[in-house]
């Protein structure tokens, strides 16, 4: 499957069906991240229920602490 991830084309060899699958493939489970799919924020509680299709654009950003 071909997705655009943070502005770069990315091919996933194993099937990814949901946003949760993408996060798992990227080893980001348990990390403090925010996900946007095709310009819409995906609430964390909906990652497993939000489908991804070839050609979708995902932006994934991590939280950065500071002071």
Which residues fall in each region the model found?
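Ubiquitin-like/PB1-type beta-grasp interaction modules and other compact soluble beta-rich domains
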Residues: 1-66
């Amino acid at each position: 499957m071909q997705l655009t991830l943070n502005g770069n084309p990315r091919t996933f060899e194993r099937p990814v069906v949901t946003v949760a699958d993408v996060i798992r493939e990227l080893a980001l489970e348990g990390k403090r991240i925010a996900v946007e799919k095709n310009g819409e924020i995906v609430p964390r509680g909906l990652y497993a229920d939000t489908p991804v299709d070839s050609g979708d654009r995902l932006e994934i950003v991590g939280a950065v602490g500071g002071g």
